[in-house]
Regions:
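Soluble catalytic domains of membrane acyltransferases
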Residues: 69-203
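Membrane-anchoring hydrophobic helices of lipid-metabolizing enzymes
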Residues: 1-84, 97-99, 109, 127
Length: 203
């Protein structure tokens, strides 16, 4: 029987990989809590059922699994010529990332790449669309090269310039300050910058 573990979420394994020798100090009740709040068993059921899907078909399966309702205004304004860097606010976390990748991936025949948290590389169906960013440890030496290759590829780039999900600030949920990387790299590689704004809420 084939080993499908690469397709699954394994909180124990991720903690060991991210924390190294310190992983043994993480209390078991914390690990169990993490498994519950990320719905590890439920998600792994979804991943097993969709292990044959990669890229945009995987994102479409995610949309169906989440029962996400997406209303789009201005899709007719998406550029048809040239390469773009699409930048967006990040209010809903994974859901807006999945939605944006699905929408743009469908429109541009799968030619999209995300700059994302490297933990998402654990998702086999999403990994081919990802340029990984390490949020918890030292950045890979290959990171500058991967970003450069991404921006110089024939894929459109998707970025959330705040780098993190929106936070409540002064009673309002809003993005942190946007980093300017998307501007400098887009100028260097002659890409148009297209802003996208999300409004929504989790049910």
């Amino acid at each position: 029987m084939a080993d499908n573990s690469i397709f699954l979420i394994d909180i124990d394994k991720i903690i060991k990989e991210k924390a190294g020798k310190k992983a043994s100090r993480v209390p078991r009740f914390v690990v169990s809590y993490l498994k519950r709040i990320v719905h590890q068993d439920e998600l792994n059921g979804f991943l097993r059922e969709n292990s044959d899907k990669v890229g945009v078909p995987f994102l479409e399966a995610c949309m169906n699994f989440l029962d996400a309702k997406l209303e789009v205004e201005g899709i007719e304004n998406l550029p048809e010529d040239g390469l773009c860097t699409f930048v967006s606010n990040h209010p809903l976390g994974g859901q807006d990332g999945v939605s944006l990748g699905y929408l743009l991936g469908k429109h541009y025949d799968g030619k999209v790449k995300y700059l994302v948290n490297d933990l998402l590389m654990n998702l086999h169906g999403l990994a081919p669309l990802c340029i990984p960013i390490n949020k918890t440890g030292s950045q890979s030496r290959d990171f500058p090269r991967m970003v450069e290759e991404g921006f110089r590829s024939d894929s459109h780039i998707i970025m959330f310039p705040a780098g993190l999900c929106s936070r409540r600030q002064h009673g309002v949920i809003q993005d942190l300050a946007w980093k300017k990387t998307f501007i400098t790299k887009s100028v260097e590689t002659h890409r148009n910058i297209v802003p996208i704004h999300f409004e929504g809420r989790n049910s």
